[in-house]
């Protein structure tokens, strides 16, 4: 196998998430990957507004990175929104205040496990794109 044994789990998780939740077809609000987000589907509404089907999400590597950066942006936005609301209400727990989301994301992206997780996402997207091309070619005949 091409993935070292120590990194098969992060790669596998990335591949499964990339296949079932972060597919290039996530740019369609009615697609299966979009439906799998259930009640969190609303998080993708801005993404649907600014992307067209088979647009940037179907560009190898770039589509994966765009979705990943979008999720990171949503993570930061929600973290600071929740932190702000809890602070206003006087309920901000010390664990939440001491958590550094920038350091967390930075360490994850620099780690080998993070690399293989992202590689799993990329492989899932590449396979999806190849299957789209093959199925489109077959439909022509």
UniProtKB/Swiss-Prot annotation:
Cellular localisation: Cell membrane
Residues passing through the membrane, by range: 7-24, 39-56, 69-91, 116-138
The entry's keywords: Cell membrane, Membrane, Transmembrane, Transmembrane helix
Gene Ontology terms: cellular component: plasma membrane
Disulfides per UniProt: none
Coiled-coil residues: none
Topology of the protein relative to the lipid bilayer: Multi-pass membrane protein
PANTHER family: SLL0924 PROTEIN (PTHR39085:SF1)
Protein name, UniProt field: Uncharacterized protein aq_2157
Organism in which the protein naturally occurs: Aquifex aeolicus (strain VF5)
